[in-house]
Amino acid sequence: MSTAPVRYVLGGRFDLVEVISEGGTSTVYRAIDRIGLWAREQSPEVAVKVVQPNGKMRQKLVQLLHREARLLRDFVHQNLVRIYDSDYDGKYHYLVMELLNGRSLAHILADRPGQPLSPSVSFHIVRAVGQGLAHMHSLGIVHGDLKPENIFMTSTGEVKILDFGTALMPNASPRHDRATALLDQIGLLTPAYASPQMLRGEPRAESDDVFSLAVVAYLALTGTHPYARLPADEALKANLTPAVPPTISPAQWRVLASGLALNRRDRIETIGDFVQRLARPHWFYRWCGQRMPLSQN
């Protein structure tokens, strides 16, 4: 059995129109929801992720796909891509999601290698992603794999978090949590964005998402990775220290540096605190007399 062909109808409902992206384990399609079309919904288009039927570790990936749907289908937030459902039609396991038009942050940064985004755009991204993560945390879920590839900038200016396959409940013991064990077997973490604690397999905490968001913020503000793309556990052993970005105030750097802390005890604990202190509006700096970022273009 090969990858689902374009024009295949999943479950008698989702007409696969075109391939959006294809990876080693799954393919994402733009699809038409026939029920939505018959109901004359304003937009019957959806995105559908299909697990490749003969891919490596297929059975474990299938478990993660359906688990992602169970965890996230009731989550509704403007900064989280909407997960509608998952199913199996006898041939293919698939996940149905909100269809987005735009580009990932990874693609945007790739078009300008080594060049930063403006502070205003960077902080807009940080605030939006932070709001989405804070909503997840309020419902007891840690994302676990935040990176530019999983941050989407829509054509209307919205920012959405994607890909919740690594999402877990915080403080679950890896020895007793089946989802954690499954993730460890598949190895879905991205070393350049995961905290040292996650790389060591320690129980998840909200501050792990703080670390990942801080790395993304630093990358957006400077065009470079704070630890030269080394895994965080190696950066810790090497005692690396990020350079201070020239476009933010000393107060903002103290907050960002705390988010980038390799030791969990030195890191800001919650996303809300991190975002509130790092990405405060411009008037705050004028009011308290702190130096504003040098560029707001």
Model-derived segments and spans:
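C-terminal lobe helix-coil module of Hanks-type protein kinase domains
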Residues: 192-287
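AlphaC helix of the eukaryotic protein kinase fold
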Residues: 52-74
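Protein kinase catalytic-loop region centered on the HRD/HxD motif
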Residues: 131-141
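Activation segment signature within eukaryotic-like protein kinase domains
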Residues: 125-126
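AlphaC helix of the protein kinase catalytic domain
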Residues: 106-117
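Conserved short submotifs of the Hanks-type protein kinase catalytic core
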Residues: 90-104
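Activation-segment/catalytic-loop signature of the eukaryotic protein kinase fold
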Residues: 86
